[in-house]
From Swiss-Prot:
Species whose genome carries this gene: Caulobacter vibrioides (strain ATCC 19089 / CIP 103742 / CB 15)
UniProt family annotation: Belongs to the complex I 23 kDa subunit family.
GO BP field: aerobic respiration
Membrane topology: Peripheral membrane protein
Cofactor dependency: [4Fe-4S] cluster
Record note on cofactor: Binds 2 [4Fe-4S] clusters per subunit.
Protein name as it appears in the record: NADH-quinone oxidoreductase subunit I
Length: 163
């Protein structure tokens, strides 16, 4: 009974309406937070997952040891790797393809890699006109790694305490 009386008083006084109207007015006069892209950009987290890249060691040798863990863990089956042994007994990839159309950008490939060879870099602007351009081969992935290496290394360093 008491609950119904309280509800009737609130309804008659329009307290819910007044509260909602006050909140709307607060946001109406608050400073705008619109970012005019591409002239302005929001800060990006070091853990941001963008365009894929294959990294190299400072000596120029590619990091990938062809363990195929990234291919095995990929839930979308977007990664295809072929490898062959080298003269020194180590393995290196002869083919490393990522179908970016299938990729769900989950980051599992990056987490599985024991040598930090495959990473998801900071690049967000890789739109294309055709689907075929989204099939990345080894050369394109290595070019991405070379282009973004400084920023990728910095982001991995910032993320190191959480790994």
């Amino acid at each position: 009974m008491f609950q119904r009386i309280t509800q009737a008083v609130k309804g008659a006084a329009l307290l819910d309406f007044a509260g909602a109207f006050g909140l709307a007015m607060k946001y109406m006069v608050a400073p705008k937070k619109t970012v005019i892209y591409p002239n302005e950009r929001n800060p990006q987290s070091p853990r941001f997952r963008g365009e894929h890249a294959l990294r190299r060691y400072p000596s120029g040798e590619e990091r990938c040891i062809a363990c195929k863990l990234c291919e095995a863990i990929c839930p979308a089956q977007a990664i295809t790797i072929e490898a062959e042994p080298r003269e020194d007994g180590s393995r290196r990839t002869t083919r490393y393809d990522i179908d970016m159309v299938k990729c769900i950008y989950c980051g599992l490939c990056q987490e599985a890699c024991p040598v930090d060879a495959i990473v998801e870099g900071p690049n967000t602007e890789f739109a294309t006109e055709t689907r075929e351009e989204l099939y990345y081969d080894k050369e394109r992935l290595l070019d991405n790694g070379d282009r973004w290496e400084r920023l990728i290394a910095k982001n991995l360093e910032l993320d190191a305490p959480y790994r």
